Amino acid sequence: MNNKNIDIIQLLYERDLIAQITNQEALIKILKSKSITLYCGFDPTSDSLHIGHLVPLLCLRQFQIFGHRPIILLGGGTGLIGDPSFKDSERKLNLIETVQKWIEKIKYQVSLFVDFSHSQYSQACIVNNYDWLSSISLLTFLRDIGKFFSVNKMINKDAIKKRLQKNNYGISYTEFSYNLLQSYDFTYLHKNYNAILQIGGSDQWGNIISGIDLIHRIYKRTTYGLTMPLLTKSDNTKFGKTEKHTIWLDAKKTSPYTFYQYWINTSDEEVYRFLKFFTNIDVDAINTLKKEDKMKNTKPQAQIILAEEITRLVHGKSGLKTAQKITRNLFTGQIHKLTLDDFEQLFQDGIPTVPLKAGITLQQALVESKLVVSRAQARELISSNSITVNSKKQLKTEYIFCATDRLYNRFTLLRRGKKHHCLITWE
């Protein structure tokens, strides 16, 4: 892409990545005239980021490609408080030691998306707001920062108003103070790093505006804010979650196979929008792909492209290759081609599992695994050639598992029909 022929704001609009923006014309003018420093904050609520964090991370990446310097703020301080924005209830307060451990793990994850290696101006950096929030005294904070905030305005912000209307408990002073802390973060980064733009999800609009106002009150300078749409699925369920799991970026929490499958199962209504959000594929190429998929009677290619692009980005070429291999062999029945590590991924979170003891019959295993509801149904499906043990159809209704059924002396894969699987782990 030729950066001289398009500005970063235009690019983000083309990819539907802007929800709100302040002082747009002035910001575009500055972005075209010089390199700026911008930041986005991530509060650690676990030891891993999840796929909901991908949009702001990739947005930071786009700004860096255009020659701007991204700062990733990890909320070691604000993460101890909890952001009440559009949350129904008070967050659990975590120990300082726990939050700091989470931050160390998250540092590696964010390094996958922005470049820390360049010595030029656009080199990214990571900061931890615990470093400055923990060193300012309460009296100093209230006198120097608190005096600029009107409680009347704060309780009328949508994020707080909805919380106050939701339940009888309302909001604690701890979480109510979060808005001041995030505003102070912007002020600190403006003073010490010359940050003039904060980006975040659309739920952060109120916090970002407060930071802009605080900087103007203290320094009489103009800064900017930009938010991206919060992703929801077409059925209004929360993006980034399945019925059982949050889709994490850490392979130990969400295996590359499950990560890949999540994107493969993206609906036709969502997939082209997600290609704009999560890949660098040109928008014209995405629109062409959409037309081609609609003209074909076969399965759309968009989901495969999306899954490949994002899995490669997060888990590398080897992670993608493994996810594709497991997918291919699992659904073609070539179980003998799966390695022990492949089975470990399936056991981690890939398919349902059931622990069983030696001597159990196939009928019992099918019931225990919930692949069938009764032994009668089990006998019927076995007789009709619908049950596979590892790679082989099993027609014996009274079949008892033997040692050769145990792959790597631990696993046996049951399949009902073509799509329903369960992994036996032998005790």
UniProtKB/Swiss-Prot annotation:
InterPro entries for the chain: aa-tRNA-synth_I_CS (IPR001412), aa-tRNA-synth_Ic (IPR002305), Rossmann-like_a/b/a_fold (IPR014729), S4_RNA-bd (IPR002942), S4_RNA-bd_sf (IPR036986), SYY-like_C (IPR054608), Tyr-tRNA-ligase (IPR002307), Tyr-tRNA-ligase_bac-type (IPR024088)
Cross-referenced SUPFAM superfamilies: Alpha-L RNA-binding motif (SSF55174), Nucleotidylyl transferase (SSF52374)
Domain S4 RNA-binding: 360-417
Binding site for L-tyrosine: Y39, Y178, Q182
GO cellular component: cytosol
Motif ('HIGH' region): 44-53
GO biological process: tyrosyl-tRNA aminoacylation
Sequence motif: 'KMSKS' region, positions: 238-242
Binding sites annotated in the UniProt record for ATP: K241
Catalytic function, reaction form: tRNA(Tyr) + L-tyrosine + ATP = L-tyrosyl-tRNA(Tyr) + AMP + diphosphate + H(+)
Subcellular location: Cytoplasm
Primary subcellular site in the record, as a coarse category: cytoplasm
Protein's UniProt keywords contain Cytoplasm: yes
Pfam families per UniProt: SYY_C-terminal, tRNA-synt_1b
EC number: 6.1.1.1
Gene3D superfamilies tied to this protein: HUPs, RNA-binding S4 domain, Tyrosyl-Transfer RNA Synthetase
Keywords: Aminoacyl-tRNA synthetase, ATP-binding, Cytoplasm, Ligase, Nucleotide-binding, Protein biosynthesis, RNA-binding
Similarity annotation: Belongs to the class-I aminoacyl-tRNA synthetase family. TyrS type 1 subfamily.
Quaternary structure (record): Homodimer.
Function: Catalyzes the attachment of tyrosine to tRNA(Tyr) in a two-step reaction: tyrosine is first activated by ATP to form Tyr-AMP and then transferred to the acceptor end of tRNA(Tyr).
Protein name as catalogued: Tyrosine--tRNA ligase
Organism the protein comes from: Blochmanniella pennsylvanica (strain BPEN)
Lineage: Bacteria, Pseudomonadati, Pseudomonadota, Gammaproteobacteria, Enterobacterales
Gene, per the UniProt record: tyrS
